[in-house]
Amino acid sequence: MAEQDSKWSELTLLPEWEEEFCCVYRVKKYGKWVMLKSLKPEYAGKLEFQSMLEKEFDVRYNLAHPNIVMINDYEYIDGLGQCIITDNVYGSSLRELINKKEISPELLLRLQTQLPDALAYIQENHIVHRPLRPEMIMITEEGKNIKLIDVGFDQRNTLKAQDCLDDIYNYGDILKQVLEVFPSKQPLLKHIADKCTDPNPKHRFHDVQELRLAIERRSSNAIYLSIIAFIVAMSILLAWLNSRRSPEHKNQPNQPTIEQAK
């Protein structure tokens, strides 16, 4: 990179995000961290792959969602060729957190809300994207929000039903991996994950909206169960307090009436 000393510095390859045709880097541009995506050297000189990368830029540049990493530019860089430039994400990938068994209740909640929201947005924009996997999901250091770092390489007027079913299957597979390392059992979420990954596509959720409704019902049920548990606990506590108080009243001597006092 001829401009490395002035414009670009501290270029670092990110092998965990390597794709079939592309490499991903973290680099400083004028002192600010960004991420680059470029074709591998063996594909960089081929027009068909250049067109593929440019089309991905065109598709992703128009995406604007809080849980999808924003694209900033499409630029030629010496030694790398044309590159897609995106915001840098400070944080850990979901894969890293799964491997470390560091899945918090807060993150589990984000996976039930933010991730389906992002998938719904992608489908609404008719984006055919790469299979969803934990490596593509970043958890930000600040806010602990979810960010999809790599979506979109084709755009159609309509999506096939299979595209939606594949998204649902991959979501369920990710949810299963998360639940395996989560400290407590989540039977209702496990049921949702099992339905997402049912071998028979006809038995899965038909679309992301149906999936989101199932998750919302699960959350509502959890709230109701918590309320019921609280009421039962309070009833037991009140019964116990009454049982403690009753013997004291029984053992107290009878107070004389006014007539007896006379």
Go through each PLM region and give its residues:
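Protein kinase catalytic-loop region centered on the HRD/HxD motif
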Residues: 117-127
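ATP-binding glycine-rich phosphate-binding loop
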Residues: 2-29
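AlphaC helix of the protein kinase catalytic domain
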Residues: 93-103
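A short, aromatic-enriched beta-strand patch in the conserved N-lobe beta-sheet
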Residues: 73-75
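Activation segment signature within eukaryotic-like protein kinase domains
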Residues: 111-112
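Conserved short submotifs of the Hanks-type protein kinase catalytic core
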Residues: 78-93
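C-lobe/activation-segment region of protein kinase-like
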Residues: 147-195
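AlphaC helix of the eukaryotic protein kinase fold
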Residues: 43-62
